[in-house]
Amino acid sequence: MMLHAQHMPGQPGAPSLVFLHGFSGDCREWQPVGEQFHGCSRLYIDLPGHGGSAAIPVGGFADVIRLLRATLISYNILKFWLVGYSLGGRVAMMAACQGIPGLCGLVVEGGHPGLQNEQARAERRLSDGRWAERFRREPLTEVFHDWYQQPVFASLTAQQRQALTALRSQNNGETLAAMLEATSLAAQPDLREALNALAFPFYYLCGERDSKFRALAQEVAATCHVIRNAGHNAHRENPAGVVDSLAQILRL
């Protein structure tokens, strides 16, 4: 089994870029950024529970990474950079730390490296369980209205919240809930030590208004690019700034 994806071929010899979206996004999320790198092969993946992969069930990160590997093989992508946002960034970090073949570099935007104690994991497990129950039982417009009131999204304007709520409400609440539980931050190990030992380039992107993740970026051995005029979802709020950073990283 493989994940649904959209593949855009590039020029021979150019690096392949594999993009992983955030929770409740899909393969279209990174395209405004990725299409600026038309010389590179680009693969935009729908994670399980999302988009064209909505019906694919997973029990945890191991299943997601197995599906990611199978998808890369199916597209004959042998050497690549992983670029992931939030949930996609956490999947990318997990894959990198487990040693996914062919990975040349890692770019994470607003991805958490992991909680550091059992109390924090227990609290997060409880919180994610409550959200999952709401996704299963309530209208998605109501759930996402509240979702975007969380502190990490404090920099969003009312108009941005409204637009995101409308967009994300097109998802399937049941499959979102299942993926939220399977890949909860509570189920993710603390990756700091493993990330600090990576043998390939690791870069971290965060919005200048995203104080939480700017602080987390200092805890991993990554070169940090701060994206101006952006909060947690920097590639949506300032795609040109993210394009500039990726161009510097990839030296294109």
UniProtKB/Swiss-Prot annotation:
Keyword Lyase in record: yes
GO molecular function annotation: 2-succinyl-6-hydroxy-2,4-cyclohexadiene-1-carboxylate synthase activity
Top-rank taxon, per record: Bacteria
Keyword Signal: no
EC identifiers of the protein: 4.2.99.20
InterPro entries attached to this UniProt entry: AB_hydrolase_1 (IPR000073), AB_hydrolase_fold (IPR029058), SHCHC_synthase_MenH (IPR022485)
Family (UniProt): Belongs to the AB hydrolase superfamily. MenH family.
Protein's UniProt name: 2-succinyl-6-hydroxy-2,4-cyclohexadiene-1-carboxylate synthase
